[in-house]
């Protein structure tokens, strides 16, 4: 929120809505700050897929946000665009650990450019779309970089928490021209991921291969 306040100060801008991808801890738990104990917000539009909506309505303390009208739920439908000013946002399903809700990514189309946002997904081979073709058809592709490589979590079976390793994503996209690889931005890094360190050898390797590593404060012009 500090970064957001710096980039879009609340004296000039208001929060016009929040889109949620799925019901995993890092993607919805911040909603609680809209509640009476903190912001006490008024009817902030909350864009949710059907299963995600059911999760919010059926479980406290999130259900209280609806009851007290801190948020106002707007239901999303898969592959159906929502028009917001000059931006169209379209949710699409991606395979993930859907214990509590479906999981979506978002296509975000502005007047001149299109961004793809996929913070969480299982292995790319499980998706019914070609990541290579998605990159070719987009201007910015922000993808899951939770873990850099296998073995990053000592003592854990990483197949139980599936994500595409950064090394796997780079290998999959390695045959793209250098310019096309520059559309790809790695996001959603776990605290164990060496890409968080801008000076790490892994960060330098990724950049040398033509890919980008998202940092706080980055802007994407649509």
Model features per residue range: what roles?
Residues 18, 46-48, 116-117, 186:
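Structural beta-sheet core signal
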Residues 114, 122-219:
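Cap/insert and terminal regions of metallo-dependent hydrolase folds
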Residues 22, 46, 89, 106, ...:
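Divalent metal-coordination and catalytic microenvironments
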Residues 1-47, 139:
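Active-site metal-binding motif and surrounding structural segment of the metallo-beta-lactamase
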Residues 51-61:
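A short, active-site helix/loop in glycosyltransferases that binds the activated sugar's phosphate group
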Residues 42, 66-72, 85-87, 207-210:
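A short helix-to-beta-strand connector/capping loop
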């Amino acid at each position: 929120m500090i970064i957001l306040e710096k980039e879009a100060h609340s004296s000039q801008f208001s929060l016009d809505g929040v889109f949620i991808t799925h019901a995993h801890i890092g993607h919805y738990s911040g909603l609680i700050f809209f509640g009476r104990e903190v912001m006490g917000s008024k009817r902030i539009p909350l864009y949710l897929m059907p299963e995600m909506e059911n999760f919010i309505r059926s479980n406290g303390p999130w259900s209280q946000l609806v009851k007290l009208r801190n948020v106002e739920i707007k239901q999303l439908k898969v592959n159906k665009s929502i028009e917001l000013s000059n931006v169209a946002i379209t949710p699409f399903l991606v395979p993930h650990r859907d214990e509590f809700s479906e999981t979506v990514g978002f296509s975000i189309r502005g007047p001149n450019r299109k961004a793809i946002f996929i913070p969480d997904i299982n292995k790319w081979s499980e998706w019914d779309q070609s990541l290579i073709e998605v990159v070719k058809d987009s201007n910015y592709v922000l993808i899951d970089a939770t873990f850099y490589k296998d073995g990053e979590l000592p003592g854990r079976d990483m197949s139980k928490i599936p994500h595409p390793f950064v090394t796997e994503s780079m290998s999959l996209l390695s045959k793209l021209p250098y310019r096309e690889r520059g559309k790809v931005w790695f996001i959603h890094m776990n605290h164990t991921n060496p890409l968080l360190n801008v000076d790490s050898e892994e960060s330098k390797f990724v950049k040398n291969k033509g890919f980008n590593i998202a940092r706080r404060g980055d802007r994407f012009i649509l």
